[in-house]
Amino acid sequence: MIKIKNIFIIVLFFSNYLFAQTIEPLKNYSLESILENDEINYKILEGCISLYKAVTELTIERYPDLGNQFSEMTETLNPYGIIALSKIQGKTYKEAENIFFNNVSSLKDQYIDEMNKNGKLNGSYFKGSFLGDDLTFCYETTKYLRLAIMESLGE
């Protein structure tokens, strides 16, 4: 029984590692490609949520209102990221949720590292980096998604 449990843990870790991503510019994708391709849709959702979580973590103590706004955007997008992952991997919502949050946590840490390096180099988390453009892109994508949700609800 212990061998099976150990094998399961190794397989779970390995599958999560294979699906984990590294940070890269998100702004290179168009809204059209996001809507037409489930894998791109997931990649953008995962990236934006991770970026929002990183900004939340870095700003919440000093600028609580700003941190809370990013946290709210994260909470808005989380279910859609989980659903997108569930769809492309054919997993249950609960399985996809676990994988999703592990991936987001890993990417968030990478964003924080990148932002801290950039902050030391340029005196800003975003100046001289693709991260500022990505943050704008993610904001526009989130705004579009919220609008689509409101329209689908008839509001």
Predicted regions and their residues:
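N-terminal signal peptide c-region/cleavage motif recognized by signal peptidases
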Residues: 15-20
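Short N-proximal segments of mature Sec-exported proteins
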Residues: 34-91
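Compact alpha-helical subdomains of small soluble proteins
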Residues: 77-155
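Extended amphipathic alpha-helical interaction segments
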Residues: 33, 58, 151-155
